[in-house]
């Protein structure tokens, strides 16, 4: 089976085209293993679509299928364009979270960056979902191991929960991340974003990704973090989101739509027996 390894700011993916009779969940676990496989945060599968130009399926490293992935969708768009599967620089992509619209910016025949319409943020507790009597779960006190944290949840394709911090301590994030992810508050689990506000136009983020763990970057996490930061008056609606490996631009428009922009790169191509 042929594959392509890609990444957006170190958030890496293996991209394959649909294969009949394959259990993609099992395949994701095998291929994403960083010791015995290719190594990646997730597996992206290219499939035909009846409602869009192309369909993207996303499987996390633990084999679970995700509804959407911001960085994954940007890698996916670059792949299908460069492979000639979709010839449009502005395309529609079917996902479990609905149809998204990546746009490729090409200079001298090379893709400079990819911008993707992430949809609109969902704040309604029951639709994130969060077990809460409040309509919105924003800046709410939650007690974990005897300590109280103020958490905010939003759905941007997938559930995200934001915690503002003054610094990034890896041991703290690795301990608290899975406790929030698997809390009974979140019936479907949640991604956890640790957010440090630098100024009104810049935030730094580290994401504990549901089914993955700490990642170098996360597109939907960048979007969720930017939206909540703006909602709470900490930043403007257009924000540079800084991850370990680089920066993503998130624009939360007045019409409630979110756009995510940044670079994506192909790492290598290869073949593997399955």
Swiss-Prot record:
Entry annotated with the keyword Nucleus: no
Location relative to the cell: Cytoplasm
Residues annotated to bind substrate: 11, 60, 70-71, 191, 209-210, 219-220
Site (Could be important to modulate the pK values of the two catalytic cysteine residues): 160, 209
Main location: cytoplasm
Pathway: Amino-acid biosynthesis; L-lysine biosynthesis via DAP pathway; DL-2,6-diaminopimelate from LL-2,6-diaminopimelate: step 1/1
GO annotation (BP), single: lysine biosynthetic process via diaminopimelate
Catalytic activity: (2S,6S)-2,6-diaminopimelate = meso-2,6-diaminopimelate
One Pfam family here: DAP_epimerase
Alphabetized GO MF terms: diaminopimelate epimerase activity
Keyword entries, A-Z: Amino-acid biosynthesis, Cytoplasm, Isomerase, Lysine biosynthesis
Active site: 69 (proton donor), 218 (proton acceptor)
Enzyme kind, highest EC tier: isomerase
EC number in record: 5.1.1.7
Entry-linked NCBIfam families: DapF
HAMAP family linked to this entry: DAP_epimerase (MF_00197)
Subunit comment: Homodimer.
Family label: Belongs to the diaminopimelate epimerase family.
Function: Catalyzes the stereoinversion of LL-2,6-diaminopimelate (L,L-DAP) to meso-diaminopimelate (meso-DAP), a precursor of L-lysine and an essential component of the bacterial peptidoglycan.
Designated name of the protein: Diaminopimelate epimerase
Organism per entry: Caldanaerobacter subterraneus subsp. tengcongensis (strain DSM 15242 / JCM 11007 / NBRC 100824 / MB4) (Thermoanaerobacter tengcongensis)
UniProt lineage: Bacteria, Bacillati, Bacillota, Clostridia, Thermoanaerobacterales
Name of the encoding gene: dapF
């Amino acid at each position: 089976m042929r594959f392509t390894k890609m990444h957006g700011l170190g958030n890496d993916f293996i991209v394959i085209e649909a294969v009949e009779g394959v259990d993609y969940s099992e395949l994701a676990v095998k291929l994403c293993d960083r010791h015995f496989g290719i190594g990646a945060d997730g597996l992206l599968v290219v499939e035909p679509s009846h409602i869009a130009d192309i369909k993207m399926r996303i499987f996390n490293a633990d084999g679970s299928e995700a509804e959407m992935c911001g960085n994954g969708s940007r890698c996916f768009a670059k792949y299908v364009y460069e492979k000639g599967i979709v010839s449009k620089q502005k395309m529609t992509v079917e996902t479990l979270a609905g149809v998204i619209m990546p746009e490729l910016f090409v200079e001298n025949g090379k893709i400079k960056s990819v911008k993707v319409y992430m949809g609109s943020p969902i704040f309604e507790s029951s639709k994130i979902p969060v077990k809460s009597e409040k309509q919105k779960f924003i800046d709410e006190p939650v007690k974990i191991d005897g300590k109280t944290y103020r958490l905010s949840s939003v759905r941007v394709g997938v559930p995200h929960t934001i915690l503002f911090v003054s610094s990034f301590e890896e041991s703290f994030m690795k301990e608290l991340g899975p406790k929030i992810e698997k809390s009974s508050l979140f019936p479907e689990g949640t991604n956890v974003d640790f957010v440090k506000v630098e100024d009104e136009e810049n935030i730094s983020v580290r994401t504990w990704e549901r089914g993955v763990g700490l990642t170098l970057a996360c597109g939907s996490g960048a979007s969720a973090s930017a939206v909540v930061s703006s909602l709470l008056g900490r930043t403007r609606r257009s924000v540079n989101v800084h991850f370990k490996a680089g920066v993503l631009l998130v624009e939360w428009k007045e019409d409630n739509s979110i756009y995510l922009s940044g670079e994506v790169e192909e790492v290598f191509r290869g073949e593997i027996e399955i």
